[in-house]
UniProtKB/Swiss-Prot annotation:
Organism: Burkholderia pseudomallei (strain K96243)
Protein name as catalogued: tRNA 5-methylaminomethyl-2-thiouridine biosynthesis bifunctional protein MnmC
The keyword Repressor is assigned to this record: no
Gene: mnmC
Region span, tRNA (mnm(5)s(2)U34)-methyltransferase: 1-242
Function: Catalyzes the last two steps in the biosynthesis of 5-methylaminomethyl-2-thiouridine (mnm(5)s(2)U) at the wobble position (U34) in tRNA. Catalyzes the FAD-dependent demodification of cmnm(5)s(2)U34 to nm(5)s(2)U34, followed by the transfer of a methyl group from S-adenosyl-L-methionine to nm(5)s(2)U34, to form mnm(5)s(2)U34.
UniProt similarity note: In the N-terminal section; belongs to the methyltransferase superfamily. tRNA (mnm(5)s(2)U34)-methyltransferase family.
SUPFAM superfamilies: FAD-linked reductases, C-terminal domain, FAD/NAD(P)-binding domain
Amino acid sequence: MTDRIVPATLVFREDGTVVSPLYGDIYHSAAGALAQADHVFIRGNGLPERWRHERAFTIIETGFGTGCNFLATWAAWRADPSHCERLHFVSVEKHPFAREDLRRAAAHIVAYTTITTITPIAPLVDELANAWPALTPGVHRLEFDDGRITLTLVFGDALDVLPNLALRAHAFYLDGFAPSKNADLWSPAIFKSLAKLADERATFATYTSSGAVKRALDEAGFAYRKVDGFAGKRAMLVGEFAPRWRVRRHEPPRAFSTDRRDAIVIGAGLAGCAVVERLAARGWHVTLIERRERIASEASGNPAGVFHPMIARDDNLAARLSRAGFLHALHRWRALERAGHAFSRSTHGLVQLATSDDEFERMRESIDALGVPAELASALSRDDARALLRTDVAHGGWLFAQGGSISPAALAAAQCAAAGDRLSRIVGVEIARLERGGDGRWRALDASGATIAQASVVVVANAADAARIAGLRHAPTQRVRGQLTLLPPGSAPAVPLPVIGDGYVVPLANGVTLTGATYEPDDTDATPREAGHRENLERLERLLPAFSANALDAGALAGRVGFRCVASDRLPLVGELGDEAAAAREAAALTGARLRDVPRATGLYGAFGYGSRGLVWAALGAELIAAQIDGEPWPLERELAEAIDPARFLVRALRHGRVA
């Protein structure tokens, strides 16, 4: 189980500095947090000059604390007319402040700063606090200044999370509590983890000049030197990554190398449109190819879909992935709405009901054991559920305060609108296969062999057809038929928000109630059937006992059929595809391969196999693909990215000698 997050306690000393009762140390110098950030970390890393020569620049910080190093760096970037196009700031924090404590601490520090040469920071404090995520373990990605500033917060113990990051760092801010107060954050293991993430030209800066820190830096491959410290401190350390021997087996990720930033996305459902928006936001020109005449015509064309995280007592991979996807989706959707790209979604929460009293007890215990914040999920007794839903229920459950329902087609349209003139659409055309030319560019071909489009990068996002088009033999997916049912106004309990459990019920704006859905593997019938409606009505009766399945004529009801694409392990396939032909040639040498050893199909990516969780997973999957293409910090832990890596099935086949 993932360790629960213990928030920091906000305490001020008499001199106005913020202090940690847990570590018995101050977060910043009494001479000023922002001045310290400027002297030690910004100037200590040769900034802003060094980022002027990069399209994107990545900083890692050990210890986010009050956020002042990030705020000072953000302000310095704003003040520099020659700044890099995109600035990535990645910060690890074991004990993050709660939102309002962070706001108070940062606002207090800014109010008492004496710096006058940096862009005003006070307005940035509220932007940061307003975007502050729920205090759950893992990676949280926030964006500011139209996505040009990316803050990737990693909540957890640095010893555990640093080895699980995937990125290439240009600068390190080493800013934990003093080595005498928090020795773990200055241990050799920390610096070895940082060395595995360092760009060849990476620099570092830290306020300490401890002998133990110098030895750990040297052992990890960092060269250091002493310079004048801040506010009368005799010395601090700065330096660069300069290993005298090999310190890592794998190089950190690089950007995809191409002279032309153009891409093809195949499939205009939730998966594909999310990728379109994320690539276009980074300046890529995208051609979207859809076999139907309009976008979101297949499973993504349902009137509504529900979104919520999954909670499991052991906080397994699927639960962690759904939580990360859910929180990231909310962040992206709000950004779309702020940009004027509106779409229909409910904002009053979602209730998940237990199917038995024993299940309810397990649900309640899971919330307590994991320390789940109430803003993410809370236990709901049977009486409270009855009052909230205004109808009878058999058991209690969970309330997901930020869950709800959404129109998938409207979301897809908003994402395409956000892409603007960087998006070209080709509809009514079916791609049969892909081919990479001698010039390194991919061509999308129809059944006759005609080239429909060509680009440097291709993302296959067309569900169950993706593996076939990409020529994958080791990507086991299955079509699962799902039939939903539409109930006329007044024929079902008028619940004020979506309810899930054994099935789901969603109130639509026109008074119609949506319920479903069947789960029928390998059934390709696209026509709604009376038996499917009857199954949905019976499921609704179990979910909401005030409803009678016999009150309606199942044969007279309207509905819709969609097809889920489900992988054999029930996790999506997201990321760069494996080169199966190259793997076959090297099979003998790859029997013990890990994912990072597998040859890749350069420029070919996948986003499919989302099953019933497209709303939860699509935004995060799109961000991961865009980050991989552009060599940016990944928006989730490497362990989670590897769990959904499309090449995972190829690795398993190699280990069992099934690739030839």
